[in-house]
Amino acid sequence: MKLEDYKAWLLEHGEIKKEYERPYNPQCDPPEYKDGSYFLSYDLMYAGRPYAGFAVGDVTALACYKYVYDESKAYLKERLKYEV
């Protein structure tokens, strides 16, 4: 299986969101505003930085960050198998 096929499979099964090209949990996906912007805290989470900011839902955000981090790590590990 080529890397492209693997990525296509992940996209098809909803494990990677096109904009981010990374595994994600649909329940943790950032809320999108009408103008297409996202909460900064989610941007920080998805950029692989620790969640910075304290607001309602911190526990959920941290859980989502951990999920995305763990999934991304697993994805990268899997991806390395297909890298030349």
Each PLM stretch: what is its role?
Residues 1-24:
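Negatively charged, low-complexity tracts enriched in Asp/Glu with abundant Ser/Thr
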Residues 17-76:
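Acidic, low-complexity, intrinsically disordered interaction modules
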Residues 83-84:
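C-terminal end-of-chain micro-motif
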